[in-house]
Amino acid sequence: MVRAHQLLAEWLGIKRVKLLIGSSIGGFQCLEWSVMQPDFAERAAFIATTPRTKPWASAFNESQRMAIECDPTYGERSAEAGLQGMATARSIALMSYRGGMAYDKTQEDENPDEASFERRVLSYQRYQGEKLRRRFNAYSYYRLSQAVDSHNLGRGRGKVEDVLQQIKAKSLVVAITSDILFPPSDHTILVENIPNVEYHLIDSDFGHDGFLVEHKQLNEIILNFLKE
């Protein structure tokens, strides 16, 4: 992925940028780019990300791939193949993106004491799966999940800790308190090994998706980082 971006930057004549920024999978690429081309960015921001995908995140991804594989149309040479399986995969992914606090905060029934089998959260899961089904491809989804699992900054380079020390850009690391996909503990290795780094923790009930929801907190952190 980074090599594709590098080719584009080269074609556009971009030799250096003020800020390289990425969150989640974008953070994977930001880290990779910062190592592959240490002088490309003056500053780099790594948000809700990790230098190496851990078993917990890969377990979610494998469950999603299993859901896609259960779709009887998966494997057909058609853009429509595997879409029902992908809708199910999306519902699995959402739980890892949001976490329990976010679900309890946003999907509780109007009258919890009277809640029956037909609960609000059930329609939410199906709606989100169908929404993705209308705009995405199951084969692309499957391959992207494999790309996430393959992420490892140390592969072919040595210990991740040593590789991180090669980053030259002034760096910002941002984690989210309730993120269960890439929890704050996953960011410790970044903070302890990137030479010139500052760390911020966003307080949010929205899990990994907190970087999409907590605009005010994140905006303030990034603006202050750029002013320094």
Locations of the language-model features?
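Active-site nucleophile elbow and catalytic-triad environment of alpha/beta-hydrolase enzymes
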Residues: 127-128, 143-163
